[in-house]
Amino acid sequence: MNNQNVDDHNLLLISQLYPNVYTPLVPQQGGEAKPTRRRKRKSKSVVVAEEGENEGNGWFRKRKLSDEQVRMLEISFEDDHKLESERKDRLASELGLDPRQVAVWFQNRRARWKNKRVEDEYTKLKNAYETTVVEKCRLDSEVIHLKEQLYEAEREIQRLAKRVEGTLSNSPISSSVTIEANHTTPFFGDYDIGFDGEADENLLYSPDYIDGLDWMSQFM
């Protein structure tokens, strides 16, 4: 029994000195063995995540720019939206920034600039559309008004035409014109004019118009 106690004591001492090498089973009062609790080691993914958070916190502190640095970057961005490697290094050196920080700032600034262009274009198209809709409504209203005027003008023309027709049918002038049109105008055959030797006495000639009758000589 003494030897067993010594062995257990030695194993317990070894497990305490080297917990990762050997984990003994410590007997409990009921005779059941209970494994000792080992400390969990962090996985590589957890370690990398923590390191990334630490680096991210440091990078966040580096991203804070002064008003003068932002103003100089804005001026450089207005000159050219693209950022070449040489220009990036030069700006970083002049402003005392990290080249990667300058590149990230330009990338974010270009994204905001593109979004602003899209918003401006959308606003312009929206205003043009609204103006077109208003103009279309105005033209539609004008067309309706012109159609009403045309309809009233056609009705007025019809009323005037009926009035003129009724006036002409009841006018005494039109009746006399109709009677005179039916009366035959007398000519030489209606008069007793002889064509013997006395014909010259019954006809009167005007010397002023004798020359105008030369064209009848071809029929005589």
From Swiss-Prot:
SUPFAM superfamilies: Homeodomain-like. Induction: By abscisic acid (ABA) and by salt stress. Keywords: DNA-binding, Homeobox, Nucleus, Stress response, Transcription, Transcription regulation. GO terms for cellular component: nucleus. Residues 58-117 bind DNA. InterPro entries: HD, HDZip_class_I_plant, Homeobox_CS, Homeodomain-like_sf, HTH_motif. Residues 118-146 are annotated as: Leucine-zipper. Its main location: nucleus. One of its GO terms (molecular function) is DNA-binding transcription factor activity, RNA polymerase II-specific. It is found in: Nucleus. Widely expressed. Residues 26-48 are annotated as: Disordered. Probable transcription factor. PANTHER family: HOMEOBOX-LEUCINE ZIPPER PROTEIN (PTHR24326), HOMEOBOX-LEUCINE ZIPPER PROTEIN ATHB-21 (PTHR24326:SF537). Belongs to the HD-ZIP homeobox family. Class I subfamily. This is Homeobox-leucine zipper protein ATHB-21. It comes from Arabidopsis thaliana.
